Amino acid sequence: MTTPLIEIRQIYKSYGNTPILNNVSLNVNHGEFLTLLGPSGCGKTTLLRLISGFEQPTLGEIFINGQCVNQLPPQKRDVHTVFQSYALFPHLSVFENVAFALRCKKTPNQEIRKRVFDALKLVQLESLAERNVKQLSGGQQQRVAIARAIINRPQVLLLDEPLSSLDYRLRKAMQSELKQLQKTLNMTFIFVTHDQEEALSMSDRIVVFNHGHIEQIGTPKAVYETPANLHVAMFIGEANIFDIQVHTVKDQDIVTNIEGIQLSCKNTGNYQVNEWLHLIVRPEDIRVWSLSEVEKTEGMLPGRIVDIIYKGSTVDLKVELSSGKIINASEFFDEDDDKLEYTLHETVWVQWLPGWEVLLPHEG
């Protein structure tokens, strides 16, 4: 079995009487793109600072390559951090910003030049080497910060919400570039974000945080499609949530009642009769039918369209059910498909196939 590059063992961190991290344990593998995901104040950036050495744990141990680093200062941990602010030297050129650490080590000039241009080439900035960083765009400044961080080829690159200040198009482009850079370097990246889309599109694994503890660790697919609890389901993407009670258990299915309609669901958790559950359906798994499109309505819920949002590639619908509950549906747009011509206040039927839902134990 491969030894993890980083081992986080039962970490606690408090500031005075305020707990920030509570019994956090985590392994990080060699060459992995791992994302720490969670809302503001959940402890993800604190964990990053503990790994880098800028903070010390109240209790617990951190190992890098099998060595406990609790007492090691940041410069001896072979990890580098890209901060949200980039922390560039505004009076220096791109070249000198990237070369700074090498000059501090009194590296020969010829070697500095080669290594700096190698790093700039990786982030596609070699043509701007002599430009002052104040003259660069936000995306270019971020690339400089990354080049400076990888100049010494650390084992781990820590990225603290580095894309948060970029506009949407640039952020999307940088997501792809960061992932490609990580693959090229075969370096371990630990990426902090509160943006679910970033986490899903970039990560090998996602660690979902909430109130200082880990809710779930898994691949993007696992975290999205099989959330461990209600918080994960609601935080990762959109979710329609129904509170249901198991009426009968039949083979591998359960039978329940939603909005007065009897529905069957896959019994994925060995749930029992009378047990209360959360039933979760993603908007993209809901199908919306006009009255003229269906003859048999068994297993369908009646509703009324109360909002239509055209997004180019998708049409998002808000449907009010008979109880007044609003659910969200998302359909891929096809301009040649008449089925996607919905009308505000139109009466419709909604459904999903058994197995497309997620069932979770009820949380009170």
Curated annotation (Swiss-Prot):
Its main location: membrane. The keyword Transport applies. It catalyses: ATP + H2O + polyamine-[polyamine-binding protein]Side 1 = ADP + phosphate + polyamineSide 2 + [polyamine-binding protein]Side 1. GO terms for molecular function: ABC-type polyamine transporter activity; ATP binding; ATP hydrolysis activity. It is found in: Cell inner membrane. NCBIfam families: potA (TIGR01187), PRK09452.1 (NF006987). Part of the ABC transporter complex PotABCD involved in spermidine/putrescine import. Responsible for energy coupling to the transport system. This is Spermidine/putrescine import ATP-binding protein PotA. The gene is potA.
